[in-house]
Amino acid sequence: MPSFDVVSELDKHEVTNAVENAVKELDRRYDLKGKGSFEFKDKELTVNLTAEAEFQLEAMIEILKLALVKRKIDVQCLEVKDAYASGKVMKQEAVLKEGIDKELAKKIVAHIKDAKLKVQAAIQGEQVRVTGKKRDDLQEAIAALRAKEFGMPLQFNNFRD
């Protein structure tokens, strides 16, 4: 039976390149030169921002978002936490979310069932497997999922006949 997987993954190399581009852009900006820094933690997929004032942090977040978009990474996966003061500097954390949690997986399965397509969806850890009898039904399911906004970037891989 034909099937495909719905996943939400990030290319860690592209994320690293985007953060490095954001650091270069930060060095080029005359209003932020020497006033802020990005620190990317690869294992946790977090970016720690440090600046002297909150408006500088907001500008740094915009620089980071632009760098992510240029590297073709959807900014919906970026969750920006609240800024907090630490001594004389302001700090903020941005977390890159990866994987489909149970709540989102249930929404995806419910959306597929509501579309009344001739496919079945099953939650398998951090992905959703969709199976059907015909390839056309699966392509309709992909189109239905692309049409709805889930708050996370979705990729469709492992398409098998």
Swiss-Prot record:
Reported function: Nucleotide-binding protein.
Record's keyword annotation contains Methyltransferase: no
Family (UniProt): Belongs to the YajQ family.
InterPro entries from the UniProt entry: DUF520, UPF0234-like_C, UPF0234_N, YajQ-like_sf
GO molecular function: nucleotide binding
Keywords: Nucleotide-binding
UniProt keyword Heme present: no
Residues forming coiled coils: none
GO cellular component entries: cytosol
Originating species: Pseudomonas fluorescens (strain ATCC BAA-477 / NRRL B-23932 / Pf-5)
Protein name in UniProt: Nucleotide-binding protein PFL_4775
PANTHER family per the UniProt record, alphabetical: UPF0234 PROTEIN YAJQ
